[in-house]
Amino acid sequence: MGIGNENKGFITASADALINWVRTGSLWPVTTGLACCAVEMMHAGAARYDLDRFGIVFRPSPRQSDVLIVAGTLCNKMAPALRQVYDQMPDPKWVISMGSCANGGGYYHYSYSVVRGCDRIVPVDIYVPGCPPTAEALVYGIIQLQNKIIRKDTIARK
């Protein structure tokens, strides 16, 4: 017993893998509910799906957030405000487009006042389809974002 010549176990990981693993466990989305998809976003944050267990805490300020969930119809008048919210977020930042209206204009695609997809205003990482998408679909989209973050090179040379 005591200190011997036993093999000691080591955990090895790259700095990229460690940083990305930490980032996946603390995604903080800013609450931007533009239409009916916001109800499903609130449903995903409530007790049944409980996004807190994934480390996801909704923040009221873009300066405290690293994920922007665009939930609903984006109109031309709201587009500059959405871009301003995106620009205020610290790096690294990710965008989830939630619902048919945010993805491509949805039901209101041919309206003069609707932006035909929020990807014309901000770069989108994950698209969640549906009208409105269910809370399960949003949770799946968040899991896909976590998988995307894990695969990203953070400090490695490109």
UniProtKB/Swiss-Prot annotation:
Names of the cofactor(s): [4Fe-4S] cluster
Top-rank lineage group of the source organism: Bacteria
Entry EC number(s): 7.1.1.-
Topological relation to the membrane, as annotated: Peripheral membrane protein
A biological-process GO annotation: aerobic respiration
Entry-linked PROSITE patterns: COMPLEX1_20K
Signal peptide span: none
Keywords carried by this UniProt record: 4Fe-4S, Cell inner membrane, Cell membrane, Iron, Iron-sulfur, Membrane, Metal-binding, NAD, Quinone, Translocase, Transport, Ubiquinone
Chain residues that bind [4Fe-4S] cluster: 36-37, 101, 131
InterPro entries found in the cross-reference section: NADH_UbQ_OxRdtase-like_20kDa, NADH_UQ_OxRdtase_20Kd_su
Subunit structure: NDH-1 is composed of 14 different subunits. Subunits NuoB, C, D, E, F, and G constitute the peripheral sector of the complex.
Family assignment from sequence similarity: Belongs to the complex I 20 kDa subunit family.
Protein name: NADH-quinone oxidoreductase subunit B
Organism: Francisella tularensis subsp. holarctica (strain LVS)
Name of the coding gene: nuoB
